[in-house]
Amino acid sequence: MNTKNLFFALLASMTALTATAQETYQDTKLIGNDLNGTARYVGMGGAMEALGADISTMTSNPAGTGFFSRTQVSVTGGLVWQNGVESHSVSGGHKTNASFDQIGIVAPLKINGKPCINVGFNYHKSRNFDQILTASGALSMASQNKLSAIKYDKVGEWGWNAIDANYQKILEKTDDQGKKYMDYYNGQAFDFGQYQHGYIGVYDFNISGAVSNSFYLGATVGIHDVNYRSSSTYFEQLEQNTNGASAERLKIDGTGVDIKVGAIFLPVDGSPFRVGLYINSPVFYDLKLRGDAGSGFVQYSGSNLSSNNSSAYIRNYCNYEYKIYTPWKFGVSLGHTVGSYLALGATYEYSDYGSIDNRVIDGTYYDPWNGSAYDTSSSDDVMNAHTERTLKGVHTLKLGAEFKPLPTLALRAGYNWVSAVFDENGFRDGSLESPGSGYATSTDYTNWKATNRFTLGLGFQASKNINLDLAYQYSHTNGDFYPFMSYYGDTNPDNNCIVRATKVSHDRNQVMATLSYRF
């Protein structure tokens, strides 16, 4: 059996999807938002939190919908694709995917024929998880199974996960004195492939309006629907004519709720210059992660452990439900218009990712009045401390402009800069005595750096009531990939398990179209 066939055996044995737990690197998938919404919003780089008058602003600054004087319905869809990647031979994946991005309505409620307050509903895809990630590199005196062997001697002090348990079942031995120990193979090279897909869909319910001609307020309640899927495979070329393999299937489902409030005011009489301020509460998530891990070896003739070609693999899995409370988000935005032909916007946002609250469900509360049952939870202090060390405060800058050379034609451009989420020295710590580490079914992680986004857009007024908007977005992020955490023991390389970073990048393109109807 060759290494690739071993992988197919591992994947075939993983028929029931099961679960892992809350963990710093998994958390970040739920927090960061893509630049998505209507094509007009994306084409202007999303810098419309002060300009308003776009349905997508209800998910950041809810006061933005207060500028609508007519009912508007809009729907958005398009394509997303990656540059410079190929589907991995085992984990698979699609480079190009269709995406349904947005649908919503804003309607003014009128009293005596005059607009009084606006109400709105909008669905948008806040995260599109479609991504192929591949990495390969050299190993020296290190391997995934060696890290498990080092942890074996520290059981009771360090966390023990599904990968460790798999290797233990294959490599655990007993010496002449009857003492158990865990053997290992040093690695020479690795190859990793992952296909992530799914989305987070946000259903926003909005109310907004003008307190005066120069002051607007708004509030939004958001329901977040999490659908995350991942399939990853990991090969190691090992010493003694041996190859190693591990595979993971991961599924995250759940819901969350948040509240957004915001204001827009015009500080200068007679001037269209606007200032927007807004606060987004944490998203209070209830989540279920299901994961399955398989690990194994192929030993060829000549190995000192086998005189004939042979293979061994084992499967492990776990179930876990938990809660995550994401950080607060604060934003300030500036907007200005010149006549009816030029609009300029700038937005700054800040969110402290290190303040994520990972929570463990530790009981059930029964309400004696109505007989309902509710989960009770407490903070996972160990994982929260790791999150605080590993993640940083994230700054987002959004710039956008719209120019109308004709009343029926708009040209748009935008730019985003999102600072790095991870500390450059951060790592996925599999030794933590936390459910997030103990229930893990993989060891890899990537420290992604800052993200740059560039956008272009076109707007066409097809009639008095119909608009067609188009947008293109390119985003680029570099990162450092690690197949597992490093362990530094002492000057003896046999007591170390050190892996160097492999440079990776994520280049994504998106084209989208929005059809809007006003009445």
Each language-model region and where it sits:
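N-terminal targeting signals for Sec/Tat export/insertion, comprising classic cleavable signal peptides
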Residues: 32-50
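Outer-membrane beta-barrel porins/channels
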Residues: 22-36, 106-519
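Bacterial Sec-dependent N-terminal signal peptides
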Residues: 1-25, 519
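Generic N-terminal amphipathic/basic segments
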Residues: 7-10, 24-35, 88-93
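Alpha-helical transmembrane segments and their juxtamembrane interfaces
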Residues: 14-15, 71, 405
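Outer-membrane beta-barrel translocator/receptor signature
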Residues: 39, 51-60, 65-139, 198-201
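Residue-level micro-sites within transmembrane alpha helices that shape
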Residues: 3-4, 60, 401
